[in-house]
Amino acid sequence: MEQDRTNHVEGNRLSPFLIPSPPICQTEPLATKLQNGSPLPERAHPEVNGDTKWHSFKSYYGIPCMKGSQNSRVSPDFTQESRGYSKCLQNGGIKRTVSEPSLSGLLQIKKLKQDQKANGERRNFGVSQERNPGESSQPNVSDLSDKKESVSSVAQENAVKDFTSFSTHNCSGPENPELQILNEQEGKSANYHDKNIVLLKNKAVLMPNGATVSASSVEHTHGELLEKTLSQYYPDCVSIAVQKTTSHINAINSQATNELSCEITHPSHTSGQINSAQTSNSELPPKPAAVVSEACDADDADNASKLAAMLNTCSFQKPEQLQQQKSVFEICPSPAENNIQGTTKLASGEEFCSGSSSNLQAPGGSSERYLKQNEMNGAYFKQSSVFTKDSFSATTTPPPPSQLLLSPPPPLPQVPQLPSEGKSTLNGGVLEEHHHYPNQSNTTLLREVKIEGKPEAPPSQSPNPSTHVCSPSPMLSERPQNNCVNRNDIQTAGTMTVPLCSEKTRPMSEHLKHNPPIFGSSGELQDNCQQLMRNKEQEILKGRDKEQTRDLVPPTQHYLKPGWIELKAPRFHQAESHLKRNEASLPSILQYQPNLSNQMTSKQYTGNSNMPGGLPRQAYTQKTTQLEHKSQMYQVEMNQGQSQGTVDQHLQFQKPSHQVHFSKTDHLPKAHVQSLCGTRFHFQQRADSQTEKLMSPVLKQHLNQQASETEPFSNSHLLQHKPHKQAAQTQPSQSSHLPQNQQQQQKLQIKNKEEILQTFPHPQSNNDQQREGSFFGQTKVEECFHGENQYSKSSEFETHNVQMGLEEVQNINRRNSPYSQTMKSSACKIQVSCSNNTHLVSENKEQTTHPELFAGNKTQNLHHMQYFPNNVIPKQDLLHRCFQEQEQKSQQASVLQGYKNRNQDMSGQQAAQLAQQRYLIHNHANVFPVPDQGGSHTQTPPQKDTQKHAALRWHLLQKQEQQQTQQPQTESCHSQMHRPIKVEPGCKPHACMHTAPPENKTWKKVTKQENPPASCDNVQQKSIIETMEQHLKQFHAKSLFDHKALTLKSQKQVKVEMSGPVTVLTRQTTAAELDSHTPALEQQTTSSEKTPTKRTAASVLNNFIESPSKLLDTPIKNLLDTPVKTQYDFPSCRCVEQIIEKDEGPFYTHLGAGPNVAAIREIMEERFGQKGKAIRIERVIYTGKEGKSSQGCPIAKWVVRRSSSEEKLLCLVRERAGHTCEAAVIVILILVWEGIPLSLADKLYSELTETLRKYGTLTNRRCALNEERTCACQGLDPETCGASFSFGCSWSMYYNGCKFARSKIPRKFKLLGDDPKEEEKLESHLQNLSTLMAPTYKKLAPDAYNNQIEYEHRAPECRLGLKEGRPFSGVTACLDFCAHAHRDLHNMQNGSTLVCTLTREDNREFGGKPEDEQLHVLPLYKVSDVDEFGSVEAQEEKKRSGAIQVLSSFRRKVRMLAEPVKTCRQRKLEAKKAAAEKLSSLENSSNKNEKEKSAPSRTKQTENASQAKQLAELLRLSGPVMQQSQQPQPLQKQPPQPQQQQRPQQQQPHHPQTESVNSYSASGSTNPYMRRPNPVSPYPNSSHTSDIYGSTSPMNFYSTSSQAAGSYLNSSNPMNPYPGLLNQNTQYPSYQCNGNLSVDNCSPYLGSYSPQSQPMDLYRYPSQDPLSKLSLPPIHTLYQPRFGNSQSFTSKYLGYGNQNMQGDGFSSCTIRPNVHHVGKLPPYPTHEMDGHFMGATSRLPPNLSNPNMDYKNGEHHSPSHIIHNYSAAPGMFNSSLHALHLQNKENDMLSHTANGLSKMLPALNHDRTACVQGGLHKLSDANGQEKQPLALVQGVASGAEDNDEVWSDSEQSFLDPDIGGVAVAPTHGSILIECAKRELHATTPLKNPNRNHPTRISLVFYQHKSMNEPKHGLALWEAKMAEKAREKEEECEKYGPDYVPQKSHGKKVKREPAEPHETSEPTYLRFIKSLAERTMSVTTDSTVTTSPYAFTRVTGPYNRYI
């Protein structure tokens, strides 16, 4: 269940991804295991899954199966790491365990997450790492563990090793450090690729078993981390918060909601580490980046990495982190923002994402997660950017982009770094980045990976140095992009990683090659993207072009932009990945990308495998990502659009710029852009939308260029995009435009790029960093920088390059010296703080920049304001701040102040320049101080205070500045920037505005252009500033439990709620708030971007406290609330694009799964402890075609029997078509032949038989009947019929939990009377048995067992068993009970059902042939042609020996009911209606006749009473007479009638044998068939109706009902209504499954006359006899022929069909046979009958007109017989039914009279049809035999009696070899294990059921869903009732004491399907009246049409009514 929950959560967030994820997860073992929830047993396989994923990684290196690989790749690490827990996780037990906030919980969670990853939630470990502490944590844990090791050694080497080991974990061994690293990176890449990972994040939400993670996260993280985050990030956060307070809040809100839900909830499972990862990352940097750095770099790197990355901050930092998170939630800009800032930055970017996130959130949190990841990416890039970068850099420094696409190669270098810092970074960063990557990070990763990969490309050329340099460069560039800290971190990671990069680059490149497919395939990203794309498809198209342009251009900006582009692109990539997932072409494109990447890699690979493959892939992926991202972005609303637009503008601008100084400027811009775009991507993705709008001309030009690139690829978009990007990156350096030559030149360019990158790898990286810093810092300048500063950027770039070089050197040093790196990592993390802040700033800045690009003004203002806070200044400032805070706290404060002042004074550009200088200084400081910072990790907290103050100061200054700026252009720009940050839509408009300015224009121009959007931004800015101030105030002043709700007026409508250190950002606000809060921005924002909530801000925190899931966006929550059945875990595998259970069968692995049958044998031998012949495995094939008899009852076609006494265990396995993964073969059934001792079995048989015979109370079960409810498979004698008895606890829909929720003293083994001794005796038997069976269950299906005992201690009252280990909650004893095919949908998910069989004494010896036996059938499976070992001969031998008995079509007598058994609801409804009708009829009836009629109808006809009564009124004469006659008749046939009544009551058709048979044949059979015609005569019913009029049985066949109805309406209106009724009646259950189309068609009529319809049914079967006698069968005939498929027959009946049918009607059996024949062969007997019927019909019409009533009166005998039948049938149901039937009869007669056709005929027809349908093959024979009797009116009686004996040969099921029906013959004492929830199963009917001496007793042990609450859920119920009472009180207060809730009304609507009939009665009655008023219509009898539709001939005056 927990897994289910996870799935639900996953479904919530990953729902879309679940499917894509499954492909990812279906990587084989993991998929299988995780899906099965039995990862432990298959831990090796889960490992294998990880390995497989690794193998997939490895084997899939070049394979585009990255989808599976992605998750898989991520999975391996986690899988390995979490092997111990995988089982639990899979089982879901650990998930809960993991929900512990403790680290151990975290570790468990990590491991669990692994499992989850295996479950498909693990797939996105990277993302999951943030989201899924388990998953994210898992890698995180792995990383952290590794990181701890690496951190402890603080050696990037160790990091690498750890990463490698992590990878190895992924890879299944540190044997391939490179591969492992690749694996890890790929895993991360997979994570990244897993845009699915986004899902993971979402899954993280899923994973969390509650708010545990929340608790952990909040508990640990928020306190310190929040403060630190606030202090460190606060400046950024402040600025960002100001900028993106809304967006931040939005991000936080959405992310808080999602993340709290997700991460907190997720972390629940993941111990909150994921939150920590995001929060931690965010927070860690806020902690001071140093903390993060320390955490990442130092052992803390391990812990921080682990904790921080894993939201550890989760266990160790969790309080802080959560506090930070809370704080972040509280204070958008505060450290919580770290996560949330990352989130917020993402939020800023994701503001759009937020708005988008609304979309994203709406998509199920996927997008949101994506956004979150984007946010986190931003946060990650900003806050966790270090981690992300580091982790991304270290793990994916080259692979950040690469990791998405190039992840495998580039991440290798970074992997090394990642382990120490990279790991923590990776964990934090990668986790966040992964989260981002799946969301934003995916984009960022793509870009970053691209950037890094690109930078790695040069390293590629000089493998180690180049990679080294390249990695640092990408790292730096990415860090700048992501964060200053990130830069440093990345540099650290990059530095360390780069060396590894060269080594690992190739593997990673290979991996990347695979990863890109993974990336491309990332289903989750794709899903997110898809979701986003749906929202943003247009934007995506634009954004894609833009992004492509951007990508094309960014390749020039390769380093900078790729990172950001990756930020952007990854989103796009996610989007595109989603697309890919959606569009197989996309994965192939992505895969193609990898190929291009690989090719490029091969070219560039020489130098840097990572770079070539990685860069191309990055470029490609970035493009892809951008494309996808664009899709996502656009999906992500404007956030991505703007970011894209910005990026595109940036790209456009940087295109030349890129081309100008591709290495430097381009890299920086690109990285910058990417970084910004990444962050801003959320931001600017909206901006992109806006940009697209604003910059559409320029952008479009760019995009057109890109489009030329991109669009050539639009599907290959990703592929080309990436190469374009690379080419663009290369080309820009080549100063050739990306768009045109990009793809061609991409490879070369990639090489060139790589060379260039190599040439400027560090410079670019450093420049990127510094330029990012300066770019960010000098955003205004750099805004122009892209344009005007492109030139200066060259120089600047070089300066930056130098600075970057220093940083890079430091990074390299860090890389070289783990401790140095750790220190640097710390510094980087400090930088991350700064960088994250800066990144936030960068993001904002780049968002600003891009907005500038897009909306020239925005960038400057943003630069000035937001840029300063979010972009350059925050980045610089933050870097500065972080470093300064760390190094120069006071200096930072002064600098910050100065910077703020400067920003204020200097307008955007000067401030930006200052910021850039500072940033450079900071970069230098960072570069050098980074190590110090790493060393001065401890400094970070103090610096945090300083930073906090500085941040506050800065925030205030920035506020002022922003205000000032807002007033001028800066103001508008800033506000716009803020707005974009705040409001994605706002950004989007900015993006549009940005779009307006040429992207190539200088940033200044862009900034100016951004000014116009400022108006909107001003509002937001103000709110952001206010919010920031409030946040600061709250943060500083708020008491721990002070709760405030801040409503930010951002597009996202972020609500910030703070309670002490916990800040909850909710994006959801009321629509009114939305309207009021985001006037300008909201106007800009699309409605999709708005996520109004019904909850007030104040309630959010409370709700969160109550349940984190309540914080989820509504769409996500709805997903959570959706039934589990649709959210099964699909393991990710590469075998198929999408798992279609309809085709391959249900997928689950908790009974066992393996790659082949031999593996299953190994598993089962290991479990069972015996080998060889003791275990028998049979292959079965899923066909999806249900084998059943003509009546719809179970049949067996193959019987698998015990072959010998040596055989102890039988295992049925299904080979999943098209799968070669670890779950290619799954176990679907396990049968232990000797399950319990025979002595015990004997004793239980006798004891249970005796007890249940005397005291048992039958349990009505729907599966007791066929779909028509007409079979008597349980027997007809209520005293002996088969029955089921339920004991123990079961699920109740009323309580949504245990049915004993309100019981003070629940009697779980309740028997008749009050005999506690008997109950105790029975209980002891069943408790002992359940205790005995549990160990067997545990041994044979450990995964399912573990799933079922997960909550044993929580809900002991709902468990059976006397010892520890109680998997069962209830048991059902079935005695000779024929269970029709069904699934036990109420069972818990990932559990199974155990059936203990006890047989009669004559069936206990092996080899004996019992007189009768009951088989357990799987109706959808057929036996394989080969045996376990693939031998056809051996299989044939089994068939010869009897081990497999092949059955053939055999005739057998079947028991059918005269009419369908009514449901309890119907019976209640009828009784209720009868009473009501009685009163109304007494009051309103003007005639005694009416009164009499109404009274009987009221009493006997509840549903149809009113209609029948009205009809009777219309036909009063006939009505009363009919009633009278019917009444007497019921008396006559009372014996059968009571039986029938009993039968309906018991819902077991066995009671009324005679009446049942007659009724059944005449009416019941037809009724059900009309309702749901059986294979033979499902159509006859309709046919008849149709035939009567349309006489086109074939056509009628299809539109039977409608035709019948239409025909009736047309030819005989009265008939029509009645046929409608008849059809309706037949349709009554609306079972048209068997093809009773007529029922469907008639449904309108049925609906209209449903009450009558039923009576007609009842009437019908009674009328069967009477009809034959009455010669009313014309309509009946029509029905039958049509039903029988005899067109000519039907046609005949149309003219004289009534008569013919009448003949049929006369002997319902005969008629049925006719019909039956008609069904089989159109109707030769029918023809004979036709003549007969024609005569009868001829006679009948006279009868019909007057005789109808006369008939009812006069033909008392026939009618009386009919009535008798009717009475019996009605009696069966109720007297009211009886009356109703009579009325129906009257009505029928009336209609008939009106139509000239007796309505009784339709009834009879129905009867006949039913009989025929009922599989009255006998009737066919009987038809011949009874034709004469049919001719005779009296013949009907015998016919009705004959109906009792219906024969079926089930021939149709045997004719088609693909129709299933594999049965096993359970023996005495055997135990059968199967997943009854997922597999359709049945038990065959017995020849002579006798529950007093049963042939078989089956004791079914199960555990229902939601049986996990103590005391049967009493507390929950009481709370629910209290809530209802409170609501009632509120309603009373609101509406007054007299207010009555509309409860009953709603129920009435549900309960009273008859009411609609009443409503239609007026029409119906009017119709009948009008028909009756006119002359009888002459039915046409010679109409035979071969057309699909019957020609309805309407004759008579009433045709005008048709």
From Swiss-Prot:
Q: Which residues form a coiled coil?
A: none
Q: What is the effect of changing Y1902A?
A: Loss of enzyme activity
- MF (Gene Ontology): 5-methylcytosine dioxygenase activity; DNA binding; ferrous iron binding; zinc ion binding
- The name on file for this protein is Methylcytosine dioxygenase TET2
The record gives the effect of mutating F1287L as: In myelodysplastic/myeloproliferative disorders; no effect on interaction with DCAF1, monoubiquitination, nor on 5-methylcytosine demethylase activity in vivo, when tested in a heterologous system
What's noted on cofactor binding? Answer: Binds 1 Fe(2+) ion per subunit. Binds 3 zinc ions per subunit. The zinc ions have a structural role.
Q: What is the effect of changing Y1295A?
A: Reduces enzyme activity
Interaction with DNA as annotated region, ranges: 1290-1303
User: Mutating R1261C: effect?
Assistant: In a myeloproliferative disorder; somatic mutation
Classification via InterPro entries: 2OGFeDO_JBP1/TET_oxygenase_dom, TET1/2/3, TET_oxygenase
Effect noted on mutating S817T: In myelodysplastic/myeloproliferative disorders
Organism (species): Homo sapiens (Human)
Report the PTM annotation.
May be glycosylated. It is unclear whether interaction with OGT leads to GlcNAcylation. According to a report, it is not GlcNAcylated by OGT. In contrast, another group reports GlcNAcylation by OGT in mouse ortholog.
Q: What is the effect of changing G1913D?
A: In myelodysplastic syndromes; refractory cytopenia with multilineage dysplasia and ringed sideroblasts; somatic mutation in a patient
Record note on what altering D1384V does: Loss of enzyme activity
A Pfam family annotated for this chain is Tet_JBP
For this protein, the Enzyme Commission number is 1.14.11.80
Q: Which UniProt keywords apply?
A: Acetylation, Cell cycle, Chromatin regulator, Chromosome, Dioxygenase, Disease variant, DNA-binding, Glycoprotein, Iron, Isopeptide bond, Metal-binding, Methylation, Nucleus, Oxidoreductase, Phosphoprotein, Tumor suppressor, Ubl conjugation, Zinc
